[in-house]
Amino acid sequence: MHYASAFAPSPKNARHNLIELRATLEDFRSTTTIPSTRPAPLHTFAGKVENGIVGKFGAEKAQRVIDSWRLLDTEYEHREFFGQDGTDPQTSNCYQFAHSYVPGLTVKPFWDIDEIAWTKKLAKSYKHIRKEFLDVTKDMSKLQQDGNNVWAGALTEEAGGYGEGWSTLVLKDRGIWDEVNCNLFPKTAQAVYNCGIPATEVFFAAMKPSTDIKLHSDFTNFVLTSHLAIDIPENGNNKCRLTIGDETRQWINGEVMVFDTSLMHDAINEADSMRYILMFRIWHPDLTEVENNALQYIYDCLSVPELLDDNEQVRTAAESQIETLRNFPK
């Protein structure tokens, strides 16, 4: 198994699966039963990761993360219908698909931002973030030259989800800040850092005019997605919209949204110019601090497998490397 791509938000088109499942709803309901699991052999990568989680965080406090890791190793995909009462499952898109799955987490299309304190702080920084973004992106050629992977498109295997009209400029990836790009957008990076956002990923996302993002799931339920709308064409005219499950909202400049992309979702830009947002992958609010740290440890092991080396000196050096990479750029 390619763990690095599996244990993370991975936008893949699930429309074909959804059509099949609607035709056999009883089969769909039966797949929501979570199978029993057992530890992977200690000599395998999966076994070493689990052993590391137990050693660092304790089996009891990190049990849901351990279960999630074991389920991934069995190639389990959680499927469940979350449509409101009275919703026709044959026409609804409110289905959850997740192969990176922590059992027992709350599922709802959009979260009330009044319940999430950092969203208010972020919204207050909107004008400064927008101004810096527009100033820096005036000269796209210079930005391309100075930055890392500026406006990179989705990977080939992901194109069925995000499509060719979507591209990103990363500030943080799997808990690691991109020093080069953060230094190009220092006010934005500092604002994000000061807000205390529990983000594993932070990036600007662009969407070309007259394009859409097809119906898909990001296949991970232990992170939610958040958007700060930065530059929305025809702002307020419902030209740029996002649908999570069966609920549709439009992006409005300066507003923050938090939603669950393990549910089927799609998006559209019907305007004649680019749409820009600042996007976050954040830990699910139901997770404990220990669970967040245990999940981050898995990310770290995927990025720096030397963390699992049998040699203590190699492990110590890897831990130092991870700590350095996680530091906020000065």
Model-derived features: where do they sit?
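Short, conserved beta-strand element in jelly-roll/cupin
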Residues: 206-208, 218-235
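Extracellular structured ligand-interaction cores
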Residues: 126, 166, 199-201, 210, ...
